[in-house]
């Protein structure tokens, strides 16, 4: 510096200084955030079967004394990229004693999220059906509420299915596959929790396994009487239209 010249210093505000100092930590946090596109998720499906029973029916009231309040099953979701397969998981710890209106969750659902298509295998009345359909589109409303599920921070979303049934979902964007249990999909990440108050049923992930997923674990089922989705729903409603409220509950379960 030449004699007579003065160095000028730019004043830095405290907020600016804090931003500069914290930037390396922000980069580090971003680098550590994981984005998962392959693995296996276990869901616990729990139904309040006492709520399924008719309180005005003498036989149903008697059944409540003999049946446990909740029926619990486990189901697995294999996912890789934009393909998923949902199927029966491990056996519950105890034999599940249940009402006839609570169906066994023995379906297999293979979904291709890119094409928006799904193939489902469902059993009902000793018959097996193979149903080709499009993935249900739900007008999800996302809210700020966060819930921790299976170690992930999950954001809440609500929507409706089957015209009027409210669905509450919790999803994480750390798992980039936009699928979920049953045939639920369409959120910006994996759905780890579902609650359907009208069906008195919840699905919550219990764990994620970061394992390679084989092609055979994503292969769509092939056995069963072949149906298109609208055709299956029409025949199902026609079959059960005279069965009353109990039949409606079974229809909801089969159409998920």
Residue ranges with predicted function:
Residues 1-36, 254-256:
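Bacterial Sec-dependent N-terminal signal peptides
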Residues 32-256:
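Extended soluble regions of mature proteins
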